[in-house]
Every structure is written in structure tokens, then in C-alpha cells.
């Protein structure tokens, strides 16, 4: 996770939790002159559109005061959904035995894109079974990770 994203998580965690939600994670996507700050919130009951709107208002107020992003950006707030993005060791740990897709910064076993079953998490290392091969991936090498939903 980049330094700005870490700062944003620290800044926005408390306001989201004050609403009774958990800050599942966030993505800051730079797209030319305009950027997107995407927050994922969750709770045990599920997230509804009203929850997203309320969190958006709360987060906007904090962002206006703190002003951590100097360029124009769009704030998006949503639930993680069924193909939820995974950001932390704890989140990967919760999905041991499930299939995930990860995009890597640096290749592992010759690939930057892996799809496999989470077999464990050891500190900041993800154990992943890909086509019968056990791979170890550093969490800081994961650019993006998502749970693959089963239907």
C-alpha cells in the first residue's frame, strides 16, 4: 500500500467506524488530472445505499478539512461486494481455502497475474496454491487482490 493510501486509511478509519461500519479498504487511482478515491465499507448486516451516502458525507467533510489530496478527485463509497477486494493479511487469512486473483508488482513464478487457493498467511506472506504449485507471495508485492465468488 502506498504512503498516501496508508495516510488516508488512518485518517478515514475513525469516521467510518463512528457510523457503525468497518473501513474494508480503499483505492486511490490516479487518472490524469482527475483521480478516484474509492472506499469500501462493510458491516455484519451488509451495506445499503443509505450507508454509502452517509459515509460519503462524513468522509467528504473530513477530506475537506484535512485536504490530503491536492488534485481534483471523485469520492466513491461502496460495499466490497461478492468479488471483494482484499487489502490486509487478516482479510486473506479469513479466506483460507477460497480462490483469489492477485495482480503483482513483480512477477512470481514468471507471472504478474495469479489465480489460486489461499492456503495460509504467515506474517506478511501469502501462501497460494496455483495449479498444484505452492507459491509464496509478499503482500507488499500485491498490487490488487480479489476474492473469486463461488456460485
Curated annotation (Swiss-Prot):
Record-stated family: Belongs to the RimP family.
Top-rank lineage group of the source organism: Bacteria
**Organism this protein belongs to:** Shewanella pealeana (strain ATCC 700345 / ANG-SQ1)
Described function: Required for maturation of 30S ribosomal subunits.
Q: Which InterPro entries match?
A: Ribosome_maturation_RimP (IPR003728), RimP_C (IPR028998), RimP_C_sf (IPR036847), RimP_N (IPR028989), RimP_N_sf (IPR035956)
Q: Name one GO cellular component term.
A: cytosol
A Pfam family annotated for this UniProt entry = DUF150_C
Cytoplasm: is it a keyword of this entry? Answer: yes
Give its localization.
Cytoplasm
Q: Some GO term, biological process aspect, for this entry: which one?
A: translation
The protein, known as: Ribosome maturation factor RimP
Amino acid at each position: 500500500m502506498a504512503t498516501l493510501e496508508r495516510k488516508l486509511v488512518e485518517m478515514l478509519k475513525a469516521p467510518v467506524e463512528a457510523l457503525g461500519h468497518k473501513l474494508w479498504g480503499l483505492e486511490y487511482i490516479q487518472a490524469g488530472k482527475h483521480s478516484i478515491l474509492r472506499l469500501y465499507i462493510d458491516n455484519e448486516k451488509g451495506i445499503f445505499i443509505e450507508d454509502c451516502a452517509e459515509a460519503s458525507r462524513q468522509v467528504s467533510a473530513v477530506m475537506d478539512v484535512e485536504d490530503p489530496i491536492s488534485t481534483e478527485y471523485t469520492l466513491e463509497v461502496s460495499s466490497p461486494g461478492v468479488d471483494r477486494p482484499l487489502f490486509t493479511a487478516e482479510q486473506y487469512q479469513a479466506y483460507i481455502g477460497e480462490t483469489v486473483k492477485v495482480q503483482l508488482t513483480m512477477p512470481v513464478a514468471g507471472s504478474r497475474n495469479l489465480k489460486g487457493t489461499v492456503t495460509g498467511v504467515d506474517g506478511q506472506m501469502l501462501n497460494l496454491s496455483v495449479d498444484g504449485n505452492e507459491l509464496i507471495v509478499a503482500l507488499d508485492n500485491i498490487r490488487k487482490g480479489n476474492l473469486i465468488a463461488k456460485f
